[in-house]
């Protein structure tokens, strides 16, 4: 009898962990950026190969109006050229090597257009597009979305720039839009800022679909409850710890952005703690 109970308990533990993995959307941060150069076709495709539910990419508007993948405002860190993305044409950006820094096997990898990246989205999966510039990119985003032929439920717009997500939601009402936020502590009050109430109010004012915040600000269950009570989605970034991911999953996070999608999914599906 004791053996049967032990077997039943083991099955429940495994089943419960599996539910965590199934309930949480695993989002590949800049593609599978732990293994491949970030924000490239190579990292995006690898993200899909690693069974990510979604892939997140960063975009800027080039000098000639193309929506291109890149994280920083300049190309210095990745390509060694200290020029703003916005001051370079796509032809100039395509001359840059954005793979060699990751290793010799990636030498020659180039900056892609969003158009090319959107074509990779498999059926039933979606792409989170983080806008790193201002709302001037929105008309070009619309052209890319229409050209892709992807359904609105396969596209998500996110940004730290409130005006961007506000205008994006007004322009693309059928596309999910989430407000990105990090946090800091107020030295005088000791309170976390911005507060969850402030974030919810801003999201509601722009009719956004929810929040996408740093996991470091998700220390209390109250944060989760308030966002859920407001009827909003709650996503987080950038989690490469299995312990943190499990804690957030148990509290009801909707999605986790990670550099290691396959690895994190395996950890969430496992009952073994590390």
Residue ranges and their predicted role:
Residues 18-274:
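Phosphate-group recognition and catalysis centered on beta-loop-alpha active-site segments
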Residues 1-9:
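Bacterial N-terminal signal peptides that target proteins for export
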């Amino acid at each position: 009898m004791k053996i049967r109970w032990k077997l039943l308990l083991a099955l429940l533990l495994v089943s419960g962990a599996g539910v965590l993995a199934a309930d949480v959307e695993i989002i590949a941060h800049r593609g599978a950026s732990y293994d491949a150069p970030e924000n490239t076709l190579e990292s995006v495709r690898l993200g899909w190969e690693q069974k990510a539910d979604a892939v997140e990419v960063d975009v800027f508007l080039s000098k000639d109006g193309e929506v291109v993948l890149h994280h920083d405002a300049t190309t210095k860190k990745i390509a060694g050229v200290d020029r703003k993305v916005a001051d370079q044409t796509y032809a100039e950006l395509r001359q840059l090597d954005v793979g060699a820094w990751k290793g010799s096997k990636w030498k020659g990898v180039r900056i892609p257009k969003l158009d090319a990246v959107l074509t990779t989205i498999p059926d039933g999966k979606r792409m989170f597009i983080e806008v790193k510039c201002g709302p001037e990119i929105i008309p070009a985003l619309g052209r890319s979305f229409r050209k892709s032929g992807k359904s609105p439920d396969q596209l998500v717009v996110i940004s730290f720039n409130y005006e961007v997500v506000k205008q994006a939601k007004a322009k693309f009402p059928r596309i999910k839009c989430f407000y990105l936020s990090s946090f800091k502590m107020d030295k005088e009050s000791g309170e976390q800022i911005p507060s969850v109430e402030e974030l919810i109010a801003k999201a509601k004012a722009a009719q956004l679909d929810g929040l996408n915040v740093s996991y470091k600000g998700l220390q209390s269950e109250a944060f989760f409850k308030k966002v859920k009570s407001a009827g909003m989605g709650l996503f987080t970034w950038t989690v490469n710890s299995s312990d943190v991911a499990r804690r957030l999953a148990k509290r009801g996070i909707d999605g986790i952005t990670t550099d290691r999608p396959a690895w994190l999914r395996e950890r969430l599906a496992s009952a073994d703690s590390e």
